[in-house]
Amino acid sequence: MKLINHIPDVTNVLTGHGPGFVLLNGQRIEHSMVVSPEYILREWAPDFSSLKENHFEQLLILKPELVLLGTGAVFRFPHPALTSCLINAGIGLEAMDTQAACRTYSVLASEGRRVVAALLIP
């Protein structure tokens, strides 16, 4: 599915998604990753069951106002112990399926928000 009709003025754009992949800057990505308007971490937790607290701690250096957690094909919410570092730092967390996270990231990034999308792509 194509996400946007124009390319927003950000460096890293999610331009599409489908079962088992996202399109980042036009390139097909078939593994979990973290993306912000200025940053890409191409290796992250491979799946939901692998999530550890340190995965979320890695996101703190990006200083986002909001983290979108794409949990794969279905919505799941991580245990609060895993995400407490974000809450303690005053960073919002929204969990949703990965396709919804892609759509939400595109909107927020195009508005100039300090958003990070942590996308699980099993």
Locate each region found by the language model.
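Short active-site-adjacent helix-start/loop capping segments
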Residues: 42-44, 75-78, 104
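Short, charged beta->alpha transition segments
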Residues: 52-58, 104-105
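Short beta->alpha connector loops
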Residues: 51, 73-75, 99
